[in-house]
């Protein structure tokens, strides 16, 4: 399985699991990063430490270190 950090711009995937600490997991779930949800990479910043994802018709920015803990299955 791949992690969310491996998506290319405009590539879509489905979230398989969120493997983070309890507090971060709760925050991610509150903003829509839950198992079965579709997610799409919209933007990578120049410093490559933040990424913007579209999830539930909302654009959310995540740090790379957090996105590495979200396991995905790429859409076909």
Residue spans for each PLM region:
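Ubiquitin-like/PB1-type beta-grasp interaction modules and other compact soluble beta-rich domains
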Residues: 2-6, 50
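C-terminal structural segments of small proteins and small subunits
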Residues: 48-76
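Short alpha-helix capping/helix-loop boundary micro-motifs
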Residues: 24-27
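A structural micro-motif recognizing beta-strand termini
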Residues: 17-21
């Amino acid at each position: 399985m791949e992690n969310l950090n491996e998506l290319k711009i405009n590539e879509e995937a489905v979230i398989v699991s969120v493997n983070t600490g309890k507090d971060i997991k709760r925050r991610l779930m509150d903003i829509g990063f839950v198992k079965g949800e579709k997610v799409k990479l919209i933007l990578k910043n120049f410093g490559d430490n933040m990424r913007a994802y579209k999830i539930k018709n909302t654009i959310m920015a995540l740090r790379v270190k957090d996105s590495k803990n979200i396991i995905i299955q790429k859409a076909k």
